[in-house]
């Protein structure tokens, strides 16, 4: 079984690293939360925290 040269390992590592960084950044920037819905949920959670001592 032939062995790979160190430059090939470095190139392979660079390609996988760039692919991983691109994949993570695309996933991060593709998520767009719905602002009005999150504000309504926040208000509901704040109003439901009435402690009866």
UniProtKB/Swiss-Prot annotation:
Annotated TM spans: 4-24
Primary location recorded for the protein, binned into one broad class: mitochondrion
Single GO term (MF): proton transmembrane transporter activity
Top-level taxon of the source organism: Eukaryota
Keywords: ATP synthesis, CF(0), Hydrogen ion transport, Ion transport, Membrane, Mitochondrion, Transmembrane, Transmembrane helix, Transport
Effect of residue 26 to M: In strain: HW00, HW09, NC37, NC48, TT00 and TT01
Record-level GO BP terms: proton motive force-driven ATP synthesis
Subcellular localization(s) per the UniProt record: Mitochondrion membrane
GO cellular component, one term: proton-transporting ATP synthase complex
Membrane topology field: Single-pass membrane protein
Quaternary structure (record): F-type ATPases have 2 components, CF(1) - the catalytic core - and CF(0) - the membrane proton channel.
Family: Belongs to the ATPase protein 8 family.
Function: Mitochondrial membrane ATP synthase (F(1)F(0) ATP synthase or Complex V) produces ATP from ADP in the presence of a proton gradient across the membrane which is generated by electron transport complexes of the respiratory chain. F-type ATPases consist of two structural domains, F(1) - containing the extramembraneous catalytic core and F(0) - containing the membrane proton channel, linked together by a central stalk and a peripheral stalk. During catalysis, ATP synthesis in the catalytic domain of F(1) is coupled via a rotary mechanism of the central stalk subunits to proton translocation.
Name of the protein in question: ATP synthase protein 8
Organism encoding this protein: Drosophila simulans
